[in-house]
Amino acid sequence: MTNIKLNYHKTHFLMSAPNIKVLPEDSGIEIAFAGRSNAGKSTALNALTQQKNLARTSKIPGRTQLINLFQVEPNCKLVDLPGYGYAAVPEQMKLQWQKSLGEYLQKRECLGGLVILMDIRHPLKDLDQQMIEWAVSADLPVLLLLTKADKLSQSARSKQVKMVREAILPFQGDVQVEAFSAQNKIGIERLSEKLDQWFSPLFS
């Protein structure tokens, strides 16, 4: 496998889509970021790219209602998916997001990996486990990012990472776990290395 190092700082916003019908051509490689509505997806994308406002963050969970695409390089895209779980929105809208999310995950051929973000203090909720289960059954590699790691002491953080690593063993598949904090720059390098690995087939 070719070793590559992409420059994520050059990432730029491409488009927002309410569903997969209006997404660009299904080609290249897309890496999707998924997680509960308050898991910190947008914050992680901003930290990775060193751009404060690339992905819009909000104090109100559930504001990412669309599929948002960002281009790293031609044929290399990052995708911010609608948050799942809690969101202070009408039920009808919530169902619409879930439909968009499900369609993207099931039908998008160029999906090359899934980054699932979970608050390190509340990991592996039911919907997170369903996501992991689905990805493993679809043969997709997964990186679990335990966000807001700065909220715990180093020993508590290590304990949580170990606990999650043990808890996911029954899922089998290619699932890795890392602590992450945008604020303290924990795990950003691990994330970019993993993305490089997933994008590398395009450069071989």
From Swiss-Prot:
Gene3D superfamilies, per database record: P-loop containing nucleotide triphosphate hydrolases
Domain EngB-type G: 27-201
Keywords tagged on the record: Cell cycle, Cell division, GTP-binding, Magnesium, Metal-binding, Nucleotide-binding, Septation
Gene designation per UniProt: engB
Its biological purpose: Necessary for normal cell division and for the maintenance of normal septation.
Family: Belongs to the TRAFAC class TrmE-Era-EngA-EngB-Septin-like GTPase superfamily. EngB GTPase family.
GO terms under biological process: division septum assembly
Keyword Ubl conjugation: no
This protein's name: Probable GTP-binding protein EngB
Source organism of the structure: Histophilus somni (strain 129Pt)
